[in-house]
Curated annotation (Swiss-Prot):
UniProt keyword annotations, A-Z: Lysosome, Membrane, Repeat
Chief localisation class: membrane
Function: Lysosome fission factor. Recruited to lysosomes by rab-7 at scission sites and homooligomerizes to mediate the constriction and scission of lysosomal tubules. May sever membranes by inserting amphipathic helices into one bilayer leaflet. Lysosome fission is required to maintain their steady-state number, shape, size, composition and function, and to accomplish regeneration.
Protein's name according to its UniProt entry: Maestro heat-like repeat-containing protein family member 1 homolog
InterPro entries reported in the protein's UniProt record: ARM-like, ARM-type_fold, HEAT_Maestro, HEAT_MROH2B-like, Maestro-like_HEAT, Maestro_heat-like_prot
PANTHER family to which the protein is assigned, alphabetical: MAESTRO HEAT-LIKE REPEAT FAMILY MEMBER 1, MAESTRO-RELATED HEAT DOMAIN-CONTAINING
Length: 1768
């Protein structure tokens, strides 16, 4: 439609909407809105819409396919509305039906959307019984009888779709349809048409069957020659008239459709196959019998020809099977094999296979194939079972899986048909179950699931159950690596685990429930229990065996240990006993091992008589002691009355000791030595079974050692000891430990023999190095040849063996054997510090075991171990070879444990030795920060064997020694006080607490724990001050380390050393006073650490200080008596240091430092003051700012307290503090604290300090800022500094800037340096100046100067460079230009500081809300900002106003424009409210301000004149009516004159004039308003549409004000209101918030003038109190309707006025106009609709539909047109 065409009807509008949709078809938002609008119109005027769509399609024959589809979709949506069906005109519907059929016939094969849209129209109409006959008639018109050419493909599909959606509507026409179809089908040649006809016929058949289901009728006819007709696959038959009605026609159709199976198109073949299947349910049974061969032989090959159509083919076959299997009449047997072969590949698909992505059709086909087997099984179950069993023998996994899954499905789904096939299934599955490991895991898992199904249906019995058992047992374990490598397939670990779990569960189920379980499983399972391959499933086998024995015992039967045990594959009793005991290894470690041990123990107890008749008694200890112990150790939380939670390693060690004790008891009760030797031999043979299981092998070595200790045959012992060395993998730590501990167990009974053999083992290494003629010695070595690396590990094992042999030595011979034999032998190895790490670790462990073995608490007496220092030297040598930061082995941990054990021996270490060993340990341990991965497991192994059970050797010794050794290091999480108030730190030994090495997070933590034990033992052995000073000297350098872990470790060790010294000090005498030398150094370095970032360091530092002061008190001769004056540790912590793991709050930090400073001042001797201050100065540069701040505070307290004694050093002290300011600038608090000391000195040199600070560059550095702040806090300095500053600032403002030539005739104002400097200083000193009274006296002058500064520099800038030749230092730096942006920003900062100082927070808040601080920097907005500031002072600080105004009076007549401007700003700001000091009205001040503004109306400055008009406008808000009445006329005249100000080129004064008039009209009498009203209304009307949004907002506001004053009595204004109401409504949703708000306020104030109650109610509800509506669109919808109903005579005026805005420059206003138009014209009565100028309005809306700028305009126009549905 052309843009100039006139639009006058709804039909034209609908045509325009359709044109819009087709034009902007790619804009989905527009297209969707048009569709929604058409839907709305269609719901009200469906016939008009349908007529329009009909005409549109006819008038636009060249419209594109997608566009025509949209129109048809619109029709479909309209007629699909059930509410409008009754309104539809039947003639129009007939036109639409014909149109749709014509459109459908016009489509081509590629126009899918167009054709489907046409079909959707017809189908939608056909769903309704009213139109279905018309639709089908129209379709049949396109399909006349006798036609040899097929109708359009979509005509056929339409009939098919109607059959699906309305079968009852189509079936009455089906005879006619089929009568036309039958002769036509043979002429259908194209594949798409054949597909369509096949689909249609399928739908017809389904419709007939659905009608039978919904409306069953008795047969009115009987089949000729047939007695029944299949009705379902279940075999029920009924005579159904409906099918019989169409049997002849369907047979004719069947003949033609069947021929389509031979089509070349795969889709056609698939559709034809499904259709043939459906027809099989419709044709006569006799015809089906005749065509069985034909159907099968033609449908089966389709799978190969039409792969993608498999689902349709399968559906056809399923329907055919339903018809054929209903009874025995159909001869299907000869073809069953072919059918199953065709269906089976579809059943072989695995929907659960994640490696293959199956389509939805493939999954449906899979399910349909299963259904086919279900249907066929109702008649041919035995044939199907044979078939599936045969398929299971196929080599392809998919075939096997398919057969297994189908069989399982049949067992579960059609069990009644499979009951008589039990023997057939059992025999048929034997071969599958007996197959070797050539079957894939997936197939095996499927077989296991089949076995479960067989068991569920009681198919597993004595007849063929052994095959099932053999299969399950065989698949309990996966293939070996060799087998997997031979197959060259990737091992599916997850699948193997699932298979193993399924097999184990199936075996247990059989053992627990099957009646013949004993016959099947006993002793068959014993063949596998000792097989290496079955090691991972020993627990499962034991569980089954134990269950069998338990069932036999419960049944009162005895186990048969004879029958079947002659089988060589069945393991013997000794082998089983050894295997079961090995299964106890590491049982408490995890659930799997616990379950294995539990089952093994239960089996030992159950079959104990089999092992030996005398073993039944000891075997009972399993349930009496060991099983309860296992339950206790396996729990992670101990009970309340039990021992504390134990460690994993200690749990395992305790468990292993208990198991070995049980083993020893079991062996001991057997008197026959041969039995013992047989058991040891069996253990030796099983060592090779655990090549890959080091833990189990290690435990078995220990078991073998315990067993050999009970054997007296020496040669047998020697042979098996050699076997232990031969079998152990010495490169594995656990096996080395197991071998060594096993040898130690043997040594308890064969000490001399073991020592001799160990020496022989040591010679193997030397024999290996021999060559030449001595090479024959290699052949005589009793074990295999070791390479170099293995020989190294063998040496490590040998070293460990000696350590455990020493532990096994009897107490009466240990010292002699140690000195004469063992040490002499080991010294040759110990002396070589260059050996490999593994050997050094073993030697350190051996040293520790030796020291433990000869500990005085163990052997008694005062025997001295002369080689102790020698061993310590070896340990130091080993440590020195390590890298401090990098932890790569357990050597340091073992060195600490060795040191802790050695230093406990006599004689005590010398000071030099203490320093030496302490330095080496600390240097190598404290810096540790990284560790090698895998050390955690390594540590666990070490702790299990090397630590856990060692102390049990002398556990019966005095408790004091045990506690001394086991005391853990300190932590921050456990704080308490002892009897004397001394802090005690202990690790929690309760639930979940860390206790020992192997429960530490890392081996690094375990190493630190052992390091602490070593230091503790050093102090306990030499508890003197000298020892403490040596150790503290080593630890002090680590207090200030940056690394957290180093500080933590250093203070932890410090506390540990001090605490142990306090407990054991020997150099303290009662009554003898002496200085505790470490006191000053410790206090100076630890006191600042009280506020360390780490809570742990804080608490430990306080603990160290407490211990230090306690020790100092002891050294005064008081002994360990309580010092009543010493602070309480817990009280100090609770009061100052309780902050959890986060850092302390600032106030708490200060209080803590103050408290500790007072304590230090009281307790630190003057003789140690110099050392204390030196330490404090070192701490000022600590890496942690909080700590350096604390040091500065301590320095301040020290200077204040003892300044009299430091007079001579005062200058040097202050100089150093100033120098430190630059070093500690990163720490603000430290600066502050150092400056606190500086202020005390600055009082005497105040002038010099000020002069220096004045010359500092701007902006001031943090140091200078802090200095000014400190100076201003001094009460003597503050007033003097203020007076000096104000005098200098006032003088500098006479010439605040200079004009700089920028080139090109352009100059710039550059601010001078002096005003900036003084303002910057003023901003600093007013922050915290004291006293406040001095500031308040000078407050008016300060404010005046700052406001003057802003007015003076508002349009200036900072100098970019310094003047040439200037010798003054550079003050205005680039940093200042970046920070302050503009010079006025410096005054803003000063004002803010002043307000903060005077606690005028509300003034700041007022400025923030108005964003006035930012406006102060803008040359156009600073006046408004100052106004906000002054008015806030009037409200919040009225006492400041009068002095400020008085100070400004002398500026009023100044020649300087900034001074006059400042005076006018103050005067204008005080018009609204002028107050006295007490906050009351000050008329005198107000009059002065008004006169000042009146006098300034003629000022040369435009901004001053503008400000005067604005200020006089504020007179409306004055509280004095007298003053208002005196000056309102003058103010109004001033505002009116402002409208015609000749210098006002940008309407700025005009805007202020309108604003002023807006405020003054309410104060003017009616006569005066009436006199100015015409002029104001004339002036204001054009302002509504001005580009300036501020002017628009002011105009709307003034219009509202005028109306509220004179509108009620002025018809002239009422007329203007109706004229302008459209503008108000449209701008209510203006682009700018201010305009929107003013419109809302004006409408709210003027609604009474409309004299419409409904309008008033609506406005009061939606625009309550002048607020904007919550939803503009909803408000306009309601209000427009009210306007139309209230003023029907003006409705056309409103519509035309609104249409004028269709061409607005604002897209939002155009949107609003369209929306308002739609709402105004919605729902009008017919008479009112007749008054509307349709052509203008409708044409405008159509033009908006084509808006090219904004899509929202087109959407709004579309929505508006939807509301015009009644304009038809």
């Amino acid at each position: 439609m052309a843009a100039t065409s006139q639009v006058s009807s709804l039909l034209d509008l609908i045509m325009s909407l359709l044109d819009t949709a087709t034009t902007y078809q790619h804009q989905e938002s527009v297209k969707n809105e048009v569709a929604e609008s058409l839907k709305t119109i269609g719901s009200h005027q469906p016939n008009v819409l349908l007529t329009a769509c009909h005409q549109y399609l006819l008038q636009n024959p060249k419209l594109g396919a997608f566009k025509r589809a949209f129109v048809l979709q619109t029709i479909s949506i309209c007629v699909d509305n059930c509410e409008v069906v009754s309104k539809l005109d039947e003639q129009i519907i007939m036109l639409i039906i014909n149109l749709a059929t014509q459109e459908m016939n016009m489509t081509k094969d590629t126009d899918v959307e167009w054709a489907e849209s046409s079909m959707e129209v017809l189908v939608t109409l056909a769903k309704n019984t009213r139109f279905v006959s018309h639709v089908i008639d129209a379709i049949l018109q396109k399909f006349p009888p006798g036609q040899t050419t097929s109708p359009h493909r979509y005509i056929v599909l339409t009939m098919a779709t109607i059959a699906v959606h309305n079968p009852f509507g189509l079936v009455p026409f089906l005879t006619d349809i089929l009568s036309r179809t039958v002769p036509l089908l043979q002429h259908v040649k194209t594949d798409p048409l054949r597909c369509a006809w096949a689909r249609a016929i399928c739908s017809f058949c389904e419709a007939v069957r659905e009608c039978e289901t919904e409306r069953p009728k008795e047969a009115s006819e009987e089949y000729i020659g047939d007695h029944s007709r299949p009705n379902s696959a279940s075999g029920h038959c009924q005579e159904v008239s409906n099918r019989a009605t169409y049997s002849d026609q369907t047979e004719a159709v069947y003949d033609v459709i069947f021929s389509w199976i031979y089509s070349k198109d795969p889709k056609t073949r698939g559709e034809a196959a499904e259709c043939v299947g459906e027809l099989c349910l419709m044709i006569k049974q006799t015809r089906l019998v005749e065509d069985v061969k034909k159907i099968v032989t033609n449908m089966i090959p389709l799978y190969r020809k039409s792969y993608n159509e498999s689902h349709m083919i399968t559906q056809g076959i399923c329907r055919f099977l339903e018809a054929a299997c209903v009874d025995e009449t159909c001869p299907l047997e000869p073809y069953l094999e072919d059918i199953l072969n065709a269906l089976f590949p579809n059943a072989c698909l695995d929907p659960d296979d994640t490696t293959v992505t199956l389509s939805t059709q493939a999954i449906k086909n899979h399910s349909e194939a299963f259904r086919c087997f279900d249907v066929a099984a109702t008649r041919f179950a035995d044939r199907i079972v044979y078939y599936l069993l045969h398929k299971m023998q196929n080599v392809a996994d998919s075939q096997k899986l398919g057969a297994i899954n189908v069989l399982r499905h049949l067992l579960n789904a059609t069990g009644q048909h499979m009951e008589d096939k039990r023997s057939l299934l059992t025999m048929g599955l034997k071969k599958l179950l007996a197959a070797e490991n050539t079957t894939s895991i997936r197939v095996k898992r499927a077989i296991v699931q089949l076995c479960v199904a067989l068991a569920d249906h009681s198919y597993v019995d004595a007849e063929g159950g052994d095959y099932v058992i053999a299969f399950l047992v065989r698949n309990l374990v996966g293939p070996t690596e060799q087998e997997s490598a031979a197959k060259k397939v990737e091992v599916d670990v997850a699948g193997l685990n699932q298979l193993r779990t399924q097999c184990a569960q199936a075996l247990y189920t059989i053992a627990n429930t099957c009646v013949c379980a004993t016959k099947l499983l006993w002793p068959y399972l014993l063949e596998f229990i000792c097989c290496e391959r079955y090691t991972p499933v020993v627990g499962d086998l034991c569980k089954c065996l134990r269950t069998l024995v338990s069932r036999e015992v419960e049944a009162g039967r005895k186990m048969d240990y004879v029958t079947g045990f002659d089988n060589p594959k069945v393991a013997g009793r000794h082998a089983v006993f050894a295997r079961l005991f090995t299964s106890f290894c590491n049982a408490p470690l995890n659930g799997l091992l616990t379950r294995r041990a539990r089952e093994a123990g239960g089996l030992i107890q159950a079959v104990a008589p089999w092992f030996h008749p005398s073993m039944e008694g000891p075997a009972a200890r399993w349930s009496e002691k060991l099983e309860p112990l296992l339950d206790e150790l396996s729990t992670t939380v101990s009970s309340g009355d039990s021992a504390p939670a134990e460690l994993r390693g200690r749990k395992i060690a305790r468990w292993h000791e208990a198991c070995l004790d049980w083993l020893s008891a079991c062996v001991a009760v057997v008197p026959e030595g041969d039995w013992r030797q047989d058991l040891a031999a069996a253990m030796g043979k099983q060592l090779d079974m655990y090549k890959e299981l080091s833990d189990e092998k290690s435990f078995l070595l220990r078991c073998l050692g315990v067993t050999l200790a009970r054997i007296t045959a020496k040669q047998f012992v020697i042979d098996h000891m050699m076997l232990m060395f031969k079998s152990a993998s010495h490169s594995v730590l656990t096996e080395r430990q197991g071998c060594a501990r096993g040898v130690g167990s043997i040594a308890t009974s064969h000490m001399d023999l073991i020592l001799i053999e160990l020496e022989n083992v040591s010679k193997w290494e030397h024999a290996r190095k021999s060559s030449g003629i001595f090479g024959f010695i290699k052949d005589t070595m009793p074990i295999r040849q070791y390479p170099d690396i293995e020989m190294i590990h063998l040496r490590a094992t040998l070293m460990l063996c000696y350590g455990h042999v020493v532990m096994a030595c009897s107490l009466d011979t240990i010292t002699q054997r140690l000195q004469n034999t063992i040490i002499v032998f080991l010294r040759n190895y110990f002396a070589n510090s260059k050996q490999e790490t593994v050997v050094r670790e073993a030697m350190l462990e051996t040293m520790r075991l030796i020291a433990t073995a000869v500990h005085p608490s163990r052997i008694g007496g005062e025997w001295k171990f002369e080689a102790r220092n020698e061993l310590l030297a070896y340990a130091k040598d080993y440590l020195n070879g390590e890298t401090p930061e990098w932890l790569t082995s357990s050597l340091r941990l073992l060195a600490c444990k060795t040191t802790a054990a050695l230093v406990q021996l006599e004689p005590p270490l010398s000071p030099a030795d203490i320093e030496d060993i302490g330095t080496v340990l600390t240097r190598q341990i404290l810096p540790m920060q990284r560790e090698k991965s895998g050390l955690k497991t390594l540590a666990f192994d070490i702790f299990d064997y090397a630590s856990s059970s060692v102390f049990s050797t002398f556990s019966g010794s005095s408790s004091s020694h045990t506690n001394i050794y086991m005391t853990p290091p300190l932590t921050a999480n456990s704080v308490a006080e002892g009897p004397n108030g001394t802090p005690i730190h202990q690790r929690h030994r309760g639930i979940g607490g860390k206790m020992e090495d192997d429960e530490s997070a890392t081996i690094m933590d375990a190493t630190m724990h052992q390091y602490g034990l070593a230091l503790e033992q050093i102090v306990r052995m030499a508890p003197t001050t000298q020892t403490i000073m040596i150790l503290l000297k080593i630890l002090l350098p680590y207090y200030g380390k940056q690394a957290d872990h180093e500080r933590i470790r250093a203070v932890d060790m410090t506390v540990l050393v001090l605490r142990v010294y306090y407990e054991c000090a020997e150099d303290i005498s009662l009554g003898h006073a002496s200085d505790f030398e470490p006191l000053s150094s410790l206090l100076g370095r630890l006191a600042p650490r009280l506020i360390d970032l780490l809570a742990h360091v804080r608490l430990q530092a306080l603990s160290a200080i407490h211990w230090t002061l306690r020790l100092a008190y002891m050294h005064k001769g008081h002994g360990r008596d309580a010092d009543q004056s010493l602070f309480s540790y817990s009280g100090f912590v609770e009061k100052y240091l309780t902050s959890g793991d986060v850092k302390l709050e600032g106030q708490k930090e200060k209080l803590a430092i103050e408290a500790i400073a007072q304590i230090i001042e009281y307790r630190l001797p003057q003789s140690q003051m110099q050392i204390y201050l030196s330490a404090i100065f070192e701490m000022l540069t600590d890496r942690q700012s909080h700590v350096s701040s604390a040091a500065a505070q301590l320095l301040t307290y020290a200077v204040m307290a003892r300044g009299a004694t430091l007079n001579a050093e005062a200058e040097i002290l202050v100089t150093k503090m100033v120098e430190k300011l630059a070093d500690i600038h990163h720490c603000v608090q430290t600066n502050t604290d150092v400056l606190a000391a500086l202020v005390a000195f600055a009082v005497h040199q105040q002038q010099a300090v000020c002069d220096v600070l004045f010359k500092q560059p701007l902006p001031y550095s943090i140091n200078i800022t802090d200095a000014w702040e400190c100076l201003s806090r001094d009460k003597l300095l503050f007033a003097v500094i203020l007076d000096h500053l104000t005098e200098l600032l006032g003088a500098s403002l006479d010439q605040p800037f200079e004009l700089m030539d920028s080139g090109g005739g352009v100059s710039a104002k550059v601010v001078n340096v002096e005003p900036c400097t003084y303002v910057a200083v003023l901003a600093e000193v007013v922050k915290n100046g004291e006293p406040e009274s001095a500031l308040m006296e000078r407050l008016p002058l300060i404010l005046t100067l700052l406001i003057h500064f802003i007015c003076s520099v508002s349009d200036t800038q900072f100098p970019v460079m310094q003047k040439e030749g200037s010798k003054n230092p550079l003050i205005i730096t680039p940093d200042l230009r970046r920070a302050a942006e503009k010079p006025a920003g410096m005054a803003v900062a000063a004002i803010k500081n002043l307000l903060n100082r005077t606690r005028s927070n509300m003034v700041i808040e007022d400025m923030n809300q108005a964003r006035a601080w930012t406006d102060c920097l803008d040359k156009d907005s600073f006046i408004q900002a100052i106004t906000v500031f002054i008015r806030s002072l009037v409200e919040q600080r009225p006492a400041w106003v009068s002095p400020l105004a008085k100070t400004m009076e002398e500026y009023a007549n100044s020649e300087s424009e900034p001074r006059r401007l400042a005076a006018v700003i103050i005067a204008a700001s005080l018009i609204r409210r002028s107050t006295s000091e007490n906050g009351e009205f000050n008329e005198q001040l107000l009059v002065k301000c008004i006169r000042r503004l009146e006098d300034s109306l003629t000022d040369p400055s435009l901004r001053i004149r503008k400000l005067c008009v604005k200020g006089l406008g504020e007179l409306s808000e004055c509280s004095s009516t007298d003053v208002i009445s005196r000056f309102v006329h003058m103010a109004v005249e001033a505002a009116m004159s402002g409208l015609d100000d000749h210098g006002d080129r940008k309407d700025t004064v005009a805007i202020e004039s309108i604003m002023a008039l807006n405020k003054l009209v309410q104060l003017t009498n009616n006569d005066q308003l009436k006199s100015i009203l015409p002029l104001v209304l004339l002036k204001i009307r054009p302002c509504f549409e001005k580009d300036s949004h501020t002017l628009r907002a002011a105009s709307f506001s003034l219009f509202g004000e005028l109306g509220s004053r004179v509108g009620e009595n002025s018809e002239e204004f009422r007329g203007h209101l109706h004229t302008n109401i459209v503008s108000l409504l449209l701008h209510l949703n203006d682009d700018f918030e201010e305009v929107r708000q003013n419109c809302a306020n004006s409408i709210y104030r003027l609604h009474g003038l409309l004299t419409s109650p409904n309008a008033s109610i609506c406005i009061e509800r939606e625009l309550k109190d002048g607020k904007q509506p919550a939803s503009y669109n909803l408000f306009i919808k309601d209000f427009a309707s009210i306007l139309a109903n209230s003023f029907p005579d003006r409705i056309n005026q409103y519509a035309l006025a609104t249409s004028n805005y269709f061409k607005s420059s604002s897209a939002r206003i155009r949107c609003n106009a369209a929306h308002l138009t739609g709402c105004l014209l919605d729902g009008l009565t017919a008479p009112l609709r007749a008054t509307i100028s349709r052509e203008l309005v409708f044409t405008g809306l159509v033009a908006l539909l084509k808006d090219s700028e904004d899509v929202n305009v087109r959407i709004s126009a579309t929505r508006a047109i939807a509301n015009l549905h009644d304009f038809h």
